Amino acid sequence: MPGGKGKSVGGKAGSKDAAGKTQKSHSAKAGLQFPCGRVKRFLKNNTQNKMRVGAKAAVYVTAVLEYLTAEVLELAGNAAKDLKVKRITPRHLQLAIRGDEELDTLIRATIAFGGVLPRINRALLLKVEQKKKNKSEA
């Protein structure tokens, strides 16, 4: 039936495969949990002169953010587990970040309510040890 009102052959309108497909987000395609679309929007809004941002760039930045977050949370969870508590607090985040040399150089920010790392100067330790030895000898 050329030219008449018949069933269309080929094309997107008549294919049954397109109707059965579900939409997948960029995050799902990349196997990520963090939202690629939101990261892309932030990248576009925060660049000078509203520069263009490629889809792959947004996926890459999202993957890096997700990896760093997982790394910090794993170390903070270990710190909380060592202290025998079930909730991660800013103190655990501080201990985790300052305990890892690479994360410490990357994250130089001050963490609110994180406290400080326990550290005693060696010179002070030597004086205390010498006093203990003098008392035990006398």
Swiss-Prot record:
- Record's keyword terms, sorted: Acetylation, Chromosome, DNA-binding, Nucleosome core, Nucleus
Compositional bias (Gly residues) spans? Answer: 1-13
Q: Where is this region: Disordered?
A: 1-32
The UniProt entry lists the main location of this chain as nucleus
Its BP terms in the Gene Ontology are: CENP-A eviction from euchromatin; nuclear-transcribed mRNA catabolic process, non-stop decay; regulation of transcription by RNA polymerase II; silent mating-type cassette heterochromatin formation; transcription elongation by RNA polymerase II
| Transmembrane domains' residue ranges | none
Q: Which GO terms describe its cellular component?
A: euchromatin; nucleosome; nucleus
Q: Could you tell me the superkingdom of the organism this chain comes from? A: Eukaryota
* Modification sites for N6-acetyllysine: 5, 12
Instruction: One Pfam family, please name it.
Output: Histone
Q: Where in the cell is it found?
A: Nucleus; Chromosome
Cite the post-translational modification comment: Acetylated once deposited into chromatin.
Gene Ontology terms, MF aspect: chromatin DNA binding; identical protein binding; protein heterodimerization activity; RNA polymerase II cis-regulatory region sequence-specific DNA binding; structural constituent of chromatin
Instruction: State the family it belongs to.
Output: Belongs to the histone H2A family.
Q: What is the role of the protein in this entry?
A: Variant histone H2A which can replace H2A in some nucleosomes. Nucleosomes wrap and compact DNA into chromatin, limiting DNA accessibility to the cellular machineries which require DNA as a template. Histones thereby play a central role in transcription regulation, DNA repair, DNA replication and chromosomal stability. DNA accessibility is regulated via a complex set of post-translational modifications of histones, also called histone code, and nucleosome remodeling.
Subunit description: The nucleosome is a histone octamer containing two molecules each of H2A, H2B, H3 and H4 assembled in one H3-H4 heterotetramer and two H2A-H2B heterodimers. The octamer wraps approximately 147 bp of DNA. H2A or its variant H2A.Z forms a heterodimer with H2B. H2A.Z associates with the vps72/swc2 subunit of the SWR1 chromatin remodeling complex. Also interacts with rbp1/DNA-directed RNA polymerase II largest subunit.
- PANTHER family membership: HISTONE H2A
Q: What is this protein called?
A: Histone H2A.Z
What is the taxonomic lineage of the source species? Eukaryota, Fungi, Dikarya, Ascomycota, Pezizomycotina
